[in-house]
């Protein structure tokens, strides 16, 4: 089995994956949402300190699951890029110590590639029995919308080490814009779930009232690129123009209108990708990353995939956000290829360089 570690941002997570059949044997995750909600976003120093406290705590639970017998572990995998340097280092230090103690190889995993491999994981059960993967491999070629943290990208995957970057954001990411709008509205952090909740409630309670209208970013731009800064600013100005304090109805209308505009922007750019020469033989498309849990985004992209006869692949909702299970299933591919990193050469990086990741 492979022990995997995830600490790229504000989630401390460990997992055990079977090398033979890619089944998830054990998974534990501690989130820091409550600690960061007061600040409206991640505070790196707080995140680092909490990882230093919590990673050893959940390692004790993992050891107890194995009855303190770590001999079945044949490799340790850890996220080394991209992410916050002060949190990545906490995971890497633990991984190095485990590799030295167990005399097993180290596997460095790109966090973004881990999100892609989250497509293969089933939801964990309460008793943590072995969970078989949905499939043993990803369909290829595979078009991918990656909406995770600071990333909004369209990727074209031909093989494990052949992933082309098709489009990315010029400024804010899809997820960051949700966090910023939630902060403008005083709704706390993280913004994605709360904005979706307000939007859903508004559409349910006021079915005959159109939500606040916002411009779709880059509406007449035919280039494969994203931008959310203008939309974010339009929301800020709309909030300022409304009577204060905002009513629940106004908050819901803002959330619904913003969500519709942001998702329409995504759909329009994915449509351009589907119409491109590179995607003409594409049969499979996937949405991955924490923000891929948004129901409205899933629904609108599913409709687009049906229009273009593409099979849509979605990660289980339990594994959309950061987790060690996705790092583990990706690490299995590294393990099979003999792709190990000497302990003294392992490094972290806050960025994922194009020629490094793709």
UniProtKB/Swiss-Prot annotation:
The gene is tsaD. It comes from the Bacteria. Its EC number is 2.3.1.234. It catalyses: L-threonylcarbamoyladenylate + adenosine(37) in tRNA = N(6)-L-threonylcarbamoyladenosine(37) in tRNA + AMP + H(+). It is found in: Cytoplasm. Binds 1 Fe(2+) ion per subunit. It is an enzyme of class 2 (transferase). PROSITE patterns: GLYCOPROTEASE. InterPro entries: ATPase_NBD (IPR043129), Gcp-like_dom (IPR000905), KAE1/TsaD (IPR017861), Peptidase_M22_CS (IPR017860), TsaD (IPR022450). This is tRNA N6-adenosine threonylcarbamoyltransferase. It comes from Helicobacter hepaticus (strain ATCC 51449 / 3B1).
């Amino acid at each position: 089995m492979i022990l995997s570690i995830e600490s790229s941002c504000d989630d401390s997570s460990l997992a055990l994956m079977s090398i033979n059949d890619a089944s998830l044997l054990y998974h534990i995750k501690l989130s820091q949402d409550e600690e960061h909600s007061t600040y409206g976003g991640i505070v790196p120093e707080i995140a680092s300190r909490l990882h230093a406290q919590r990673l050893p705590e959940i390692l004790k639970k993992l050891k107890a699951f194995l009855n303190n017998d770590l001999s079945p572990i044949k490799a340790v995998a850890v996220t080394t890029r991209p992410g916050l340097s002060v949190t990545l280092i906490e995971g890497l230090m633990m991984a190095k110590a485990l590799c030295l103690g167990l005399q097993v190889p180290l596997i460095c995993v790109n966090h973004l590639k881990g999100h892609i491999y989250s497509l293969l994981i089933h939801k964990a059960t309460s008793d943590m029995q072995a969970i078989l993967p949905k499939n043993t491999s990803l369909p290829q070629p595979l078009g991918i919308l990656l909406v995770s943290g600071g990333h909004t990208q369209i990727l074209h995957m031909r093989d494990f080490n052949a992933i082309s970057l098709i489009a990315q954001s010029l400024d804010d990411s899809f997820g960051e814009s949700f966090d910023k709008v939630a902060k403008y509205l005083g709704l706390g952090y993280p913004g994605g779930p709360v904005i979706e909740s307000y939007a859903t409630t508004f559409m349910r309670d006021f079915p005959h009232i159109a939500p606040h209208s916002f411009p779709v970013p880059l509406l007449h731009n035919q280039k494969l690129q994203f931008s959310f800064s203008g939309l974010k600013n339009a929301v800020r100005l709309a909030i300022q123009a409304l009577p204060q304090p905002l009513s629940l109805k106004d908050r819901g209308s803002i959330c619904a209108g913003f969500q519709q505009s942001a998702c329409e922007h995504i759909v329009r750019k994915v449509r351009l990708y589907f119409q491109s020469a590179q995607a003409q033989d594409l049969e499979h498309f996937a949405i991955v990353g924490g923000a891929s849990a948004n129901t409205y985004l899933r629904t609108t992209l599913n409709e687009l995939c049906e229009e273009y006869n593409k099979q849509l692949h979605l990660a289980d909702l339990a594994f959309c956000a950061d987790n060690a299970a996705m790092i583990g299933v990706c690490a299995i591919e590294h393990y099979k290829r003999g792709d190990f990193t000497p302990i003294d050469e392992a490094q972290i990086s806050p960025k994922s360089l194009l020629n490094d990741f793709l």
